Amino acid sequence: MSNFYNNNPRRNTFRLTERIKKKPYQTLIVFILIFLFLYVFGPFGEKKSNNNNNNHPVSKTSSFTESLYTKFQTETFAYRANGDLKKYDISIITQFTVDRFDRIAMMADKWRAPISAAVYITSFKDIDEVFKLVRNSFAVTEFVDLHFLFANKTRYPVNNLRNLALRNARTEWCLLLDVDFISPLGMYDYLHSTLEKLDTSNNNNNNNNNNNNNNNNNNNNNNNNNNNNNNNENNDNDNGNNNNNNDNEKNFKKKQEDLKIDPNDFEGDLKAIEKLKRNGEKLYVKNLKKVLDGSENNLGKNINFNNNNNDNNNKDDGGGGGYYLNSDNSNINNNNKIAFVIPSFSSSISRFDFPDNKKDLLDFIKQDLIKEINSGVCPKCHGPTNYSRWYLSSEPYLVQYKWIYEPFLLYNRSQIHDYDERLKGYGFDKNSHTFGMAAAGFDFVVLPDAWIIHMNHVSKPWEGADTFNEQMFDCLSIVCESILPDAKSKNGYDPNAKLFNEPLKNNDNCLTREHW
């Protein structure tokens, strides 16, 4: 052993080992000093900040800035659904990672209509796993088109995935959902029926306009002769009617405030609304058909998924306050840009117990087994939906957009812009897109008999080593400095003026938690 040691060219190394064995505390000190140096100055060091409870610094890491415009390799229709999807006119748009594949199967099992899904692929193993899982779900094989987006060293590219799924949807009408949401059975049929009546409404309105134009041309001379005689009488009537309408609206709104709508006392609320109607008060909630084309005909007589009649079927909606339509529909845009709001909830109960009709849903809510989505985390994110009003509604109603509203929407994809692909990771991806829709003139109409429920799960980190806060405030910086002002400029608004109570560029209140 001694000869081997003395003759070995690496004997200096052995001697070093001998010395280390004799004085291990010296080596330990060296390792500690190296670790401290790397922790403070190296890649493991956490970027310190002097932020307060509300403010947060924007990450200056090169990985964040370099990834803003990263390109991704994609493969569209990596799997194409086997079913005949030509007969459908609405698709769900969603995105997910391979470990959430079971959720897309659950979604497809309830939706039973086209789904365009983008899958985030991080390895070849993911591809094998996808095709193995596809074979295990009949609903997926029949209804789901899968498009692959391959990872490229960035945070989770949520908007790249959404755009990939959206561009390759087989229908013009699309419902954007996260993969953890489940719809009730029959919701596709309800939405399809709503769109059918919307098309019929528009066609009838066009025909009526053509007929009216012809009649107007024939009657112009007669009308001109009669106008002078009727002017004085009309002026008197208009003044009287306007005064009556204003008085009725004020009285009804005051009585609504007196009702103090309680979402946990649905039966009492319904009785109070019925009492108002029996007293002959004028209600200011119009049905969707009148909102869109001025027709007096009803659109949705509370279309139920299972033909179960709720207590409030075919009743005018007394609402719970909120946004009222003017009698002349002056609130409504004339560009036919409509987005339908699907109220969203969350629950930890088994998905097999999720309700498929509104009456059962309300029972679960009263038992606190199903809750409004994000009500404790971000009340402003879904506040304009006005859940208290929705519980009682049997007809669609218009809501007023306000930043930071982020409902799940059914829209015509030909009318919207892409989701901003600079936003990667967690935060403000849907909020900012909805802001752009509002700036472009969209109306947001809540449907009374459609909803989705989030299947609660243990939170997992988003792609990337950065924290939730870092990802969220990095995204918020892009939203404040670029996305919001750009959306206003594109639609003819002053980028430096508030439009929907949104934060302004270079404002101290932008990078704070005050938004939500």
Swiss-Prot record:
GO terms for molecular function: glucuronosyltransferase activity; xylosyltransferase activity. One of its GO terms (biological process) is protein O-linked mannosylation. Residues 1-24 are cytoplasmic. It is found in: Membrane. Disulfide bonds: none annotated. It is a single-pass type II membrane protein. It comes from the Eukaryota. Its main location: membrane. GO terms for cellular component: membrane. Disruption phenotype: Slow growth, aberrant morphology and development. Produces a severe defect in spore formation. Cells are more adhesive. Alterations in glycosylation on membrane proteins and decreased gp130 and gp150 levels are observed. Residues 46-516 are extracellular. Residues 202-246 have a biased composition (Low complexity). Residues 199-250 are annotated as: Disordered. Keywords: Glycoprotein, Membrane, Signal-anchor, Transmembrane, Transmembrane helix. The chain crosses the membrane at residues 25-45. Glycans are attached at N152, N386, N412. It holds the Pfam family Glyco_transf_49. Belongs to the glycosyltransferase 8 family. Highly divergent. May have a role in modulating cell adhesion and glycosylation. Essential for development. This is Glycosyltransferase-like protein gnt15. It comes from Dictyostelium discoideum (Social amoeba).
